[in-house]
């Protein structure tokens, strides 16, 4: 099986319990099951054929190279369309390493897909983007987003019901992310309501990093960053509901926190591995 990969490096911009002091060993896969008009990684998400072609053995060696550099974990970004071959790679990696595996996903995937990885994924890091089918259709071309994502997140919690954090670094568990969008705070509150109905309230990461990318510069709803008031409306509601988790400084809403997908960096890493 061939994977399409755009980046494989230590990443310091995840939640503190994921990035820690040394970085998260992050692998960005190309392609995506959604079509978010505001995607900040749109240059790799729009096509599964972008990036470099990587074999299963090469992917395994990339994992080991990140471990050797001190990564706190292996962080798989948008991996759902590779679940079956990933299972084979992860089974081999787990035999040789105790490093936690992070599954970083938009949550628009099947429960069956996730069950393939039961016992192989240590930390689930899903988004819950919307409850509103109108917003998910208008912004991501997926009217059934919540209908698929919510059961998927319940399955993630079934697999990893306890959050285990050692020396400030998560070893097992679930963190649900939510990106606050401009003019959409009521739906953000509905997202939190839905998460509060789970068997156990998950840790939540309420993100303020939205900024309009080129495709939505003139969008009637998405053409600006969120305001302090919008963000506080959501974080205050999370506090009322009793959530624990993570917030962001609004200064994070900048392209400076978007990773570089310069393929020469990945080519250089592959060359070092082979040498």
Task: Describe these PLM feature segments.
Residues 90-91, 117-118, 140-142, 259-265:
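Short low-complexity, flexible loop/linker segments enriched in glycine and/or proline
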Residues 161-275:
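Auxiliary Fe-S-binding modules of radical SAM enzymes
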Residues 118-135, 201-210:
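Non-cysteine beta-strand/loop elements that form the S-adenosyl-L-methionine
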Residues 25, 74, 101-103, 124-126, ...:
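Hydrophobic faces of well-ordered beta-strands that scaffold small-molecule active sites
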Residues 44-58, 77-88, 93, 109-110, ...:
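Conserved non-cysteine loop/helix-boundary elements of the Radical SAM core domain that shape
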Residues 1-119, 123, 132-134:
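Conserved Radical SAM active-site core
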Residues 80-82, 107-109, 130-132, 180, ...:
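Active-site-proximal loop/turn and secondary-structure-junction residues that shape catalytic pockets
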Residues 65, 92, 116, 155, ...:
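Alpha-helical scaffold elements within enzyme catalytic domains, especially in hydrolases
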């Amino acid at each position: 099986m061939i994977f399409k990969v755009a980046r494989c490096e230590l990443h310091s911009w995840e939640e503190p319990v994921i990035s820690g002091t040394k970085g998260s060993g992050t692998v960005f896969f190309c392609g995506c099951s959604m079509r978010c008009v505001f995607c900040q990684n749109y240059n790799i998400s729009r096509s599964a054929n972008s990036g470099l072609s990587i074999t299963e053995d090469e992917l395994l060696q990339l994992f080991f190279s990140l471990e050797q550099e001190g990564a706190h974990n292996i962080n798989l970004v948008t991996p759902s369309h590779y679940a079956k071959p990933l299972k084979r790679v992860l089974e081999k990696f787990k035999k040789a390493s105790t490093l936690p595996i992070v599954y970083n996903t938009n949550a628009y995937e099947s429960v069956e897909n996730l069950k393939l990885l039961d016992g192989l994924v240590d930390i689930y890091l899903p988004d819950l983007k919307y409850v509103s089918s109108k917003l998910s259709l208008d912004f991501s071309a997926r009217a059934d987003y919540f209908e698929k994502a919510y059961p998927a997140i319940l399955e993630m919690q079934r697999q990893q019901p306890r959050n285990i954090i050692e020396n400030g670094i998560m070893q097992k568990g679930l963190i649900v992310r939510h990106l606050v969008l401009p003019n959409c705070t009521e739906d953000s509150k509905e997202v939190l309501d839905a998460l509060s109905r789970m068997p156990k309230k998950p840790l939540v990461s309420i993100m303020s990093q939205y900024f309009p990318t080129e495709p939505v510069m003139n969008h009637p709803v998405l053409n600006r960053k969120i305001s302090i008031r919008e963000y506080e409306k959501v974080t205050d509601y999370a506090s009322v509901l009793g959530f624990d988790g993570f917030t962001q400084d609004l200064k994070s809403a900048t392209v400076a926190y978007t990773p570089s997908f310069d393929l020469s960096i990945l080519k250089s890493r592959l060359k070092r591995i082979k040498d």
